[in-house]
């Protein structure tokens, strides 16, 4: 499967706007997908998104600027839907049992070869995108993500890579 690639740069709100503008219809399709599987009313989803907006803002206000930029670029009337996308795992974990059928990451030493599978819905495969983010002259990020989501599986130009896995815990956590 070949994924489309887009490149964005600038300040967080500018990157978000470019992301939203380039992937507007894909973002709408991603919102529709999650709205169906969240198993909650739109009002409940948006209330949860408000909570996660404050958590995200407390952690890093620039992330909120990027999320708001995505909503503006994609012409999403309610930016809370973009917060819901960026909090999808947390919202899903409230009702959908998650466990052994989630993604797997692996690393081989000493070369530090890193890989991950993406065990999620086949309905999202055609929406996935390779996003290249030029953060600064010295920093570029390449990641596989879902439209409207500011961070997922990828690597930066300094050689730091990130995988995304769901970890099951015996108590809820709020924050990072």
Feature names for model-found ranges:
Residues 1-176:
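N-terminal mature-domain region immediately after signal-peptide cleavage
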